[in-house]
A protein has these predicted regions:
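A non-transmembrane, solvent-exposed segment enriched in polar/low-complexity residues
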Residues: 20-181
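Bacterial Sec-dependent N-terminal signal peptides
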Residues: 1-28, 292
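Short active-site neighborhood of thiol/selenol oxidoreductases, capturing the structured segment around
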Residues: 275-293
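N-terminal "domain-start" segment that seeds a small globular fold
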Residues: 243-278
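Short amphipathic alpha-helical coiled-coil/interface segments
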Residues: 139, 143, 175-193, 197, ...
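N-terminal targeting signals for export/organelle localization
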Residues: 76, 88-91, 104, 112, ...
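Short, small/polar residue-rich loop motifs at catalytic or cofactor-binding pockets
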Residues: 48-49, 260, 284
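Conserved hydrophobic/aromatic pocket- or pore-lining residues that grip, position, or stack substrates
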Residues: 209, 264, 288
């Protein structure tokens, strides 16, 4: 049974790495004053490239195109007045997983999210027809309560410890309690994400989530990184996306929790080249802070 599942995941991953035969066909319906506004899709590169564009007419739009594989894209509705230079300040925007399938969009021009975050914009684009997007939304729902609790604890830490500390009022005991609470919630979110990756190793959503672990903002051990690498390698093989992931994983292992520090060469205040190990006292805990310019 295990071998059968491995073969199935491998087939799905190969389909991802290879070009798909079908194109995407998006039809949309937007409520509110939107006549003549431009709707476009941007890829996830830097700088992002526009892959398709159309104009909203009678509250509707339609566009067709083809992508090599499912991936994370951005939709934009440009509300810049006619005759004015387009500006991100006038964009409505959101991200989703695009695939070559028939997809529908529905939204309200008055409530859709803006390019720059606006807490008053609480609406969302309703997207149907992309199985990859459905899986992504399912994953977000699975960690929604944990994420909500984490954000709440973070807000409490800000109000009860951080801001008072700016006035030299240190609620240390409460700060420690909340810091531990945040750390525990982070641990649970990491574990839930790892479970999702292991349950869906052939999905680009899982590969993307694993990739986010390697950005340096989430603390993983070298063993956890190795485990993720092995899970994904079994179904992604030498696909370019997997090759890129492996390279980042090897770099991440060097700065993972428990890994020996990199004994890099530095310049001391006198301009002399020294090894990092020469600057560290023995038998003590040392906090290092690096600034780049």
């Amino acid at each position: 049974m295990k071998n059968l599942l491995t073969v199935l995941f491998l087939v799905l991953a190969i389909q991802y790495c290879q070009a798909q035969n079908k194109s995407f066909h998006i039809t949309g319906s937007i409520q509110g004053p939107c006549e003549g506004m431009v709707f476009k899709l941007l890829d996830n590169s830097y700088p992002p490239q526009t892959i398709a564009t159309t104009v909203i007419k009678d509250h509707c739009f339609e566009l067709t195109g083809e992508i090599p594989a499912p991936g994370f894209y951005r939709w934009i509705i440009d509300t810049t007045p006619v005759g004015k230079k387009s500006s991100e300040a006038n964009w409505l925007a959101g991200n989703f997983y695009l695939e070559n399938s028939d997809i529908t969009f529905q939204g309200d021009i008055h409530t859709l999210p803006t390019y720059y975050w606006n807490p008053e914009r609480k609406g969302k684009m309703i997207i149907q027809g992309s199985e990859t997007e459905d899986l992504y939304q399912s994953f977000k729902t699975s960690i929604q309560e944990l994420s909500k609790a984490r954000n709440q604890a973070d807000g409490e830490y800000l109000e009860q410890y951080h801001r008072p500390a700016l006035d030299n009022i240190f609620n240390t005991e409460e700060g420690i309690r909340l810091a531990r609470r945040i750390s525990e919630l982070d641990r649970q979110i990491i574990q839930a994400t790892i479970r999702f990756i292991k349950q869906n190793p052939a999905s680009v959503v899982a590969l993307d989530q694993a990739g986010y672990f390697l950005l340096g903002e989430i603390d993983l051990t070298s063993g956890q990184i190795e485990d993720l690498q092995n899970t994904l390698s079994g179904v992604w093989g030498n696909c370019p996306r997997m090759t890129e992931f492996k390279e980042k994983a090897e770099m991440a292992k060097k700065i993972a929790i428990g890994a020996p520090f990199q004994d890099i060469e530095l310049t001391d205040p006198e301009g002399k080249k020294v090894k990092l190990s020469e600057c560290l006292p023995t038998g003590k805990y040392v906090m290092l802070e690096f600034w780049a310019s």
